[in-house]
Every structure is written in C-alpha cells, then in structure tokens.
Amino acid sequence: MTSDAAAPAASASFSDQAARLRDGARAAWRKRWVRWLAILLSIPVILYFVLWLLFARGLPSAETLLTYQPPLPTTVRDINGEPVQSFARERRVELSYEEFPQQLVDAFTSAEDKTFFTHGGLDYPGFVKAVINYTLHIGSGDRVAGGSTITQQVAKNLLVGNEYSVTRKIKEAFLARRIEHVLTKQQILELYLNQIFLGRNAYGVQAASRAYFDKDVSQLTLPEFAYLAILPKAPNNYDPETRTERALARRNYVLREMEKNGKISAAQRAEAEAAPLGTVRGPQNSVRNIGGYFMEELRRQLLDQYGEGTEKGPNGVYTGGLWIRSSIDVAKQRAAEQALRDGLMRYDGNRGWNDPGLKIDVAGDWRGALARAPFGVGYPDWRPAVVLAKSGGTARLGFTDGSQGDLPSYAAATPKRGTASPAFDFLTPGTLVAVKRNGADWQLKTIPTIRGAMVVEEVASGRILAMQGGWDLKGDDFNRATQALRQPGSTFKPIVYSAALDNGLTPASIIVDGPFCVWQGAGLGNKCFRNFSGPNAGPQTMRWGVEQSRNLMTVRTANQIGMDKVTRRAHDLGVGDYPNYLSMALGAGDTTALRMTNAFATLANQGRALKPSLIDYIEDRNGRVIYRADTRPCEGCNAPDWDGKPMPRPPLRTKQVVDPMTAYQMVHILEGVVQRGTAVVLRDLKRPLFGKTGTTSGPTNVWFIGGTPEIVAGVYMGFDHPRPMGGYAQGGTLAAPIFKQFALEAFKDMPAIPFRAPAGIRMVRIDRRSGQKVFGAWPTDDPKAAVIWEAFKPESEPRRAFGRDEEAQPAAAAKPAKRAARPQAQQPRDSDFLQNQGGIY
C-alpha cells in the first residue's frame, strides 16, 4: 500500500476510536453511580473557587512581607551615646534569624507548631478541628483556640487581623499557602519571633527576654527558652508572679515535647524541669529612663515633626525605630534634679505634712492602681505606697512590686499642714503616701506644694544639657521650664543695661538712685517706682546699680535710652515681645525659664544668638541621618588633606544680636553680682561666674540665672497659682543656693576658665564706687577693694583720673548723697509702684 493510500485509512481509524469513546461515555453517564461520582469530585473544585471568590480575591499580597518593617521603638541616647529613654507602644528589638539560639527555635516549634519545617502552611486536621470547634461554640461567648500553624499566626498578626470568625480562619489558610510560596521557613520564623506579643508590653523574643529575665535572648538557658515559648497564646495565664504553678506546669510540658521531638535529651529535660522560673519582678527596660521633663519635651518636639505612627511618614515616634542623639548630660541632669528638689524642700519641707489627696480601692487590684496613680515622689530613695490597713500605732503599707511594710505612728508624727494633729491620724486605707526607708520600717515624707524649674545650656552651641520642669513628671507633667509663663523680675535688668551700653552709657556711667515718677494722665496721677528697702543712694555707677539690683536706676536708664530700645533687645534675645511700658524694664512681662537662660547664654556667647536644642541628630531605622541640629557646611573637613594647612573651621552658626563688646561688658558687670552683689552666696565657688538674681512682687517668684563661660543655668521657684512666698523670699536666698548646689556637683571636674574679652575691649582701672579712672593703685583679690578692672569700648573710658591719695574720697563723697536722698515716707504716694529688690510691682 502506498503512503498516499495509508493516510485516509489512519484518519478513518482515529474517527472510529473517537466515536467509540463518545458512545462509551454516553453509556457510562446513563449509569447513576457515575453521575454521582462526577458530582462529588466537582464539589471541592467548585467550593475552592467559591471560597477564592468570597475570601481570597481581596486579600493583601504575601509579597508585602518581603519588605515588612515591624513597629520599632524610638531610642534616645545621651550626649555620650548611652541609651537613656525609649518611646514605644510596642517594646520590640528586631533580630535576624541567625541571632536566634537553636534551642529557642526548638522550644517555640515544639510548643506551637511541631511540623512547621515540613508542612506547606496548614495543619489540615488542626484547621478542620478549629472550624468545627468554632461552629459548635457559636453563641456561647467562648473563644476557642487551636489549629493555627506558625505561618497562619504570621498571616493573622501581620495581614488579616485578630477578628474571631470562620472567615478569618479561611483567610488565614489562603494567606498561609501564599506566604509559604513567597518566604522561606527561616524568614517566616524570623517574622514570627520578632512580632509575637509575649506580655509585659514585650513584642518579640528579645524584648520579652529583657522583660522577664533582664538579659539578652542569647544569654537565656533552656528552661528560660521553654518559658518564653508558652507565652504566645495567653501571657496573662502564665504570669510568673501570680500564676507560678500553672506557668511551671506548662513550661515543663514544652520541655517534654522538646524531648519527644528529639531536640533535647532526657537528662537535659530533667535538669531544666528542676529549675525555677527565674524571672525578675515587673517589666524590665534596657534603657535608664533618665530626665523625665527633658525627655517629655523632646517627645513633644518629635511628635510635632514626625507624628505618632505613619500619619506623617515612615518615621513615627512610636513605630519608626528612630535613633536619636540627644544633648542630655546625665550627670548634670541628675545634679539639676537633686538641686531643684532640695531647694523646694528647703522652702516647703518643714511646714507640715501635705496630704496629696489621692486614694485608691485596696479591695481590688491595688498594685495596678498604685502603679497607675499620678503620684511622683521625686527622690530615688522615696517610694510611693498605699495604706492597706491601720491597727493601733502601725499602718500597713503596700508597694507597687507587691511587697508590704509598716509605718509606725512615731514616723508619721509631723502635723498635717493646717492642723496641730499628727499626720498619722489622717491616714486611712487607700491613702497614697510617700515614704522613705527607716531601718526595718518606713518614715512618712511630704511632697512640697511649691514648684520650680531649672534649665542648663551649653554656651558654645545652645544645647540643653539638663532640664527639670517640676518635682516629678509622673505626678505632674506640666513642664515649667518651657510652659510656665512667669515674670522674670530683676533677671530682666541685664537686657535693659545691655541696650544702654549700646546707646552711649558705660559701666562707669553715673545714674541717680533717687525718686522717679511717671505722669500717667489726668485722673491717674503719678506712677512712682521704688526700691525694696533702704534709703536711695543718690548718684552711683551703672555697675553698682546692677550689683545691688536697684530698681530706680533701672527705670531711669530705660527712660533715658527709650523703652523701644529695651523691648527690641528683649525681642532680639528671644525673651519675648513686650509693649514699651517702663514696668517692662523691671521684668513685668511674662517669659519662660528656657528663654531667659538662653538670653544669658547669648550674652556669654559674646552676643551671638543661640537656638536652644535638645536633639543633636536623628537617624532612621536604616541608619540614614534625617535631621541634624548643626547644618553648617565645613569646606575642607577631610582629615587627610589637613597636613600643612590651617585647621578648617565651619562658618558661625547664628547671627550677631548683641555687639560682642557690649555682651562682654554686661557679663563683666554680672560677675560683680556674684562677687559683692545680691548673689554673693556663690562667691565661695571660687571660679569665674556671672549671674543675676530676681524676685517678683509679692514675692511670688524667685530667680537666679548665671554660669561660666561654658555653661549657663537658670532656676526659678514659685507656686503654680501665684501667691506670696513670704517676705524673706528673694532670689539670692532661695534660687541662688539651688544653682550653687548644682554647680558644686556639675562643675567639680571642669577647669576654672575666665571669660574672654573680644577684640577692642580695654580693661581700665577705676574706682568702683565713683567710676573714675585710677592711677597709682591696682586691683586686688579682695572683692570689696576700691579699685577694680572695668571693661570699656574704645574711646569710652573715663577721662578724669585720680591718684592713690584720692582713693578714699569717692566713698566719703557718697555719704552726703545718701543723707540727701528723700526719705521713703516723703515719696509720692499716687498709684505707688512698690518694688521688691530685684522685683516688679
């Protein structure tokens, strides 16, 4: 047969076979069991596509997990790079899979998913069981757990959510299959161990290791790995403090599972079962939580810039994993906290016990209520406590860690403020108290009602090294360093005199310390300014007026040069914007401790403006710098190219707001305030210091601001709702000692560097009382010596001079002027403007 004839024959044979198959299929379909079998086989396929259409089509892509970034806390470090604070809603430290110890992986897979490394994302028997259990418990209110693999838990936690329903389980199943095709087993486990919530606000195994054992996960032991592995389903059910036996039983179950799965030997299991839980009390944090008010101000600034989460971008404060180098100096911060608290206690601590007025229910969870109460005790060795019971002469106290102690009546014998009865009589169950350890018992302490603030600033940069805005942030988050508007009193006077030095006056200029009144118009009469005490001194030098904080000399000077120049200088120094009223010259305008401290730091910086900053720079989670406080370019700042060349210097950071010679003259005058003026209490610090005291009318606030060429600190005290502090209260007696205590600690390792005069300043010997130039005599170390060095601008020094034999004349000449001053009783009484020394009306 030829090939041409064979082709039609083959075609006919194929057609016959197809026809026979069709006939066979028709015959088979006529049989009932074949039809039922086909229907049964098609149901799963149809069901799968229906489920896919209903649940899987709109699910998020598993590929997003390849670039998933978990919420990470913001870590704040101090000036030396040490961690001091963190901001987070979820405490988490991200680790790579290689950083997980193998026994940790074995413990979690044994407890949560024994077939994790072999299944394809689902444990089918467990999945079906979970769906059936859910169906059986519909309407019961019970939440049935089980059936979820680690992959499903990753899908639930990161993509689906925690809704309790069959639909969520089905979505989990679809996503688990997708995840297994996108990620490796190691990547899935890395996501899981970094994301899972394990109690004590710890997310991920590293944070949990710190929270429960106060060490890194790499340092844990086998029984500690097993304990962490029992926590994912219900951390509270295995709390090591309240449910110890249940936690031990479950931990030992995990150890037995590890042995059954061949991960550990019988000997290892037995040794681990014999070990206690070994957890620490309460959540532990790897950072030190230093500088409450400083960190709260820093947090506010970060929230303004970056937001809480992702609403302003990927660098949210609570989720972005920012790395912040702050300007806080821990040693100076602690010194500021201690000094301010001690100063508040010196004023208020001996006035009786102040009941904080806080109570909790001791019949319930008093530990949690005590921990949440807005009650800060300030000192590290004081503790907040609640009175649990009272019997006879003893009150039983409870503490946040669950421990208890006794407060005997003799340790609470201080009268309650406003009464003659001992504080012990007013203690009832539920009362919150501050106590300090006294041998085996405790002693009642009182929280002062007066408040204050302290700011410490670096002169060269404007960096804030320390900030204390009150007694304790926990009991009071109002930051008086930045938020409290207060009248600065006489600390404002250097602003007046610096403007005067720019407008023709010198430190030796003679200004009359005598009556000064301003006509206010018909029906209002005169407004007459007065000094706080003593007769008016007559003509005196500007220096003397600043050192003795004379109000009459200040308002006379402000009136002479024009208040517009004074308010312009206050604006340039960042103190505030004020109307051109003479009362502003005496500190009647509101400002903050931070602004005033920065103004004094600007003077110490030879008049160059400073921008107070709490942050040096910020890095995102990938180490990229996203903010830097100092943005100056530095041309040639490449070390290998320095050889044989001058050291490169970046441009100056800010503009000149006060003439450098004027700024130095003002600082030089303010050194006299410490040597022989209202801040003489600081003289025995025996180092170059400048500063100014302030006391406002009432007196309601007391101030001191000053420092060295390197550091300036400002402090004030006063009640939040202004009321008189008592006639003896002055900046020199209350605020300056706070600065002194701070300086003794903060400056002890700092060299005593003198203030540096700028180019053009001439240092001239003058008589400090008359302001006349002296020849034939020299200044001495005696702060009250007649002859001193004074700073003058070119061509401004006194022309007339007198010799050594005339040195005593100025003091004698001043006496008639003092006697000639008008007695206080004869001064005008119309709308008197009563002044405290260093104060306002």
Description of each model-found segment:
Residues G292-G316, M454-Q487, S498-A499, A604, ...:
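Active-site beta-strand/loop architecture of penicillin-binding DD-peptidases
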Residues P73-I79, F100, L220, R383-F399, ...:
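A short, well-structured edge-of-sheet supersecondary motif
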Residues M1-S3, E63, R281-V287, G320, ...:
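Soluble, non-transmembrane domains of envelope/secretory-pathway proteins that act on or interact
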Residues F108, M258, A336, G392, ...:
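Active-site SXXK
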Residues H137-Y164, S218, P283-I290, A460-R463, ...:
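Conserved catalytic neighborhood of penicillin-recognizing serine enzymes
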Residues M1-R77, T115:
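N-terminal type II signal-anchor transmembrane helix
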